[in-house]
Amino acid sequence: MSDTNNHSKNIIHRILTEQINLTSNELDTKSTKEIVNIFSEADKEPQKAVERVIPELINAIDEITARLKSKGRLFYIGAGTSGRLGVLDASECPPTFCSNPDLVQGIIAGGIPSLTRSSEHLEDVSEIAIADLKDRNFSYRDVLIGITASGRTPYVIAALNYSKSISALSISISSVPESDSTLDNDIDIRLITGPEILAGSTRLKAGTATKMALNIISTSVMIKLGKVYGNRMIDLSVSNDKLLDRAIGILFDIGSVDKDTAVRLLKKTNGSVKLSLLIALSGMDVIDAKQLLNDSKGNLRTALISFKDN
């Protein structure tokens, strides 16, 4: 009896992301084909996890959009893989949507060096998170998305606590149930993908689900901010030949202009696809088109409706 009790006391409780995945047991004995098949099957879980949190994603997108329309900014914060995913998503916003680099920012424990070299020990230093936010003048107007697969990263927990304390919008993304971790937030996104193929390696299923969620959040917010027309990136930054070709294609498809006209419009508008489209579709000159876009808060569809109504 006493031996049994002692054994029970010594049982380790593992949070979900640290538990053993029975389908990948004895992984080192599998053939290459078997390993790939195990991964292929496991990678169906991230999609299911995202589908389960659609209501939370909708809420997050609408709340973030409202904050950004009121001069707020969006910050991702995390350590290790979670931090890298946030930095990756934030860094893609300026070239994709021509957004100000300050509008969406990614913060990783340890800063830029941690993007290429592991600094996992820094995830336990709570004070650094608050300092990182203060260095960026993080305020009540802003939004913080704290990313922590385990739901237990001190760096992220401290950031969320600070965010809540100053009434900023606080959103958490984790891959464990509330029974494993309770986080201080306004919106709680739980991407439950189960135990990893490699126990504890949350760069796998948890990381994939997180990347999917961040794609949805940032892209949807930018759509709401008028950065997209139809399904085209009309606020893209024309900075290389590939993007110039894309811009010309957008003007051809939506503005119904030939290549030479598209190039002339882009030169006239300093590479602004959105402004070029408004000119092509309305016949307005640059000054009037620019004024109408400003009056329409940068939304091309709103500007076109206003032009037609007048």
Curated annotation (Swiss-Prot):
<keyword id="KW-0456">Lyase</keyword>
<comment type="pathway">
    <text>Amino-sugar metabolism; N-acetylmuramate degradation.</text>
</comment>
<protein>
    <recommendedName>
        <fullName>N-acetylmuramic acid 6-phosphate etherase</fullName>
        <ecNumber>4.2.1.126</ecNumber>
    </recommendedName>
</protein>
<dbReference type="InterPro" id="IPR005486">
    <property type="entry name" value="Glucokinase_regulatory_CS"/>
</dbReference>
<dbReference type="GO" id="GO:0097367">
    <property type="term" value="F:carbohydrate derivative binding"/>
</dbReference>
<dbReference type="GO" id="GO:0016803">
    <property type="term" value="F:ether hydrolase activity"/>
</dbReference>
<dbReference type="Pfam" id="PF20741">
    <property type="entry name" value="GKRP-like_C"/>
</dbReference>
<dbReference type="Pfam" id="PF22645">
    <property type="entry name" value="GKRP_SIS_N"/>
</dbReference>
<comment type="subunit">
    <text>Homodimer.</text>
</comment>
<dbReference type="InterPro" id="IPR001347">
    <property type="entry name" value="SIS_dom"/>
</dbReference>
<dbReference type="GO" id="GO:0097173">
    <property type="term" value="P:N-acetylmuramic acid catabolic process"/>
</dbReference>
<dbReference type="GO" id="GO:0009254">
    <property type="term" value="P:peptidoglycan turnover"/>
</dbReference>
<comment type="similarity">
    <text>Belongs to the GCKR-like family. MurNAc-6-P etherase subfamily.</text>
</comment>
<feature type="active site" description="Proton donor">
    <location>
        <position position="92"/>
    </location>
</feature>
<dbReference type="GO" id="GO:0046348">
    <property type="term" value="P:amino sugar catabolic process"/>
</dbReference>
<dbReference type="InterPro" id="IPR046348">
    <property type="entry name" value="SIS_dom_sf"/>
</dbReference>
<feature type="domain" description="SIS">
    <location>
        <begin position="64"/>
        <end position="227"/>
    </location>
</feature>
<dbReference type="GO" id="GO:0016835">
    <property type="term" value="F:carbon-oxygen lyase activity"/>
</dbReference>
<dbReference type="InterPro" id="IPR040190">
    <property type="entry name" value="MURQ/GCKR"/>
</dbReference>
<feature type="active site">
    <location>
        <position position="123"/>
    </location>
</feature>
<comment type="function">
    <text>Specifically catalyzes the cleavage of the D-lactyl ether substituent of MurNAc 6-phosphate, producing GlcNAc 6-phosphate and D-lactate.</text>
</comment>
<keyword id="KW-0119">Carbohydrate metabolism</keyword>
<dbReference type="InterPro" id="IPR005488">
    <property type="entry name" value="Etherase_MurQ"/>
</dbReference>
